[in-house]
């Protein structure tokens, strides 16, 4: 949301565009991509699949996420906008890996 203010200058009136700080802080909501424990696929397969689907994950990150899901039932893969979150989750599902998304608080 923007507000236009007229200010007197030396020669003419000048239009100045001001943005409300609240409008700048209004960001799109983020979503968590969750990996669920998988008793079917091997740990190695899940680690490889995580790195293929989310290329910014290091091997160590992928292993940590896989172990978190294995030990706790669910692991946090990434927090991002809705569209990439849906893509990541669906890509994991297409590889036979259980995944879901939920809104980040």
Swiss-Prot record:
Q: Which Pfam families match?
A: ClpS
| Coiled coil (UniProt feature) | none
TM spans (from-to): none
The UniProt entry, under Gene3D superfamilies, shows: 3.30.1390.10
* Superkingdom of origin: Bacteria
Q: Which InterPro entries match?
A: ClpS, ClpS_core, Ribosomal_bL12_C/ClpS-like
Q: Which GO terms describe its biological process?
A: protein catabolic process; proteolysis
In terms of PANTHER family, this protein maps to:
ATP-DEPENDENT CLP PROTEASE ADAPTER PROTEIN CLPS, ATP-DEPENDENT CLP PROTEASE ADAPTER PROTEIN CLPS1, CHLOROPLASTIC
Spell out the family assignment given in the record's similarity comment: Belongs to the ClpS family.
Q: What does this protein do?
A: Involved in the modulation of the specificity of the ClpAP-mediated ATP-dependent protein degradation.
What HAMAP family does the record tag this protein with?
ClpS
Summarize subunit and interaction data from the UniProt record for this chain: Binds to the N-terminal domain of the chaperone ClpA.
Q: What's this protein's name?
A: ATP-dependent Clp protease adapter protein ClpS
Q: List the lineage, top down.
A: Bacteria, Bacillati, Cyanobacteriota, Cyanophyceae, Synechococcales
């Amino acid at each position: 949301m923007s507000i236009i203010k007229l200010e007197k200058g030396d020669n003419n009136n000048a239009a100045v565009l001001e943005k409300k700080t609240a409008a700048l802080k209004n960001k799109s909501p983020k979503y968590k991509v969750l990996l669920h424990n998988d008793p079917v696929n091997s740990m190695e397969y899940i680690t490889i699949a995580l790195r293929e689907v989310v290329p910014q994950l290091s091997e160590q990150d992928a292993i940590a996420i896989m172990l978190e899901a294995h030990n706790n039932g669910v692991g946090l893969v990434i927090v991002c906008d809705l569209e990439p979150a849906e893509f990541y989750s669906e890509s994991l599902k297409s590889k036979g890996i259980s995944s879901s998304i939920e809104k980040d608080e």
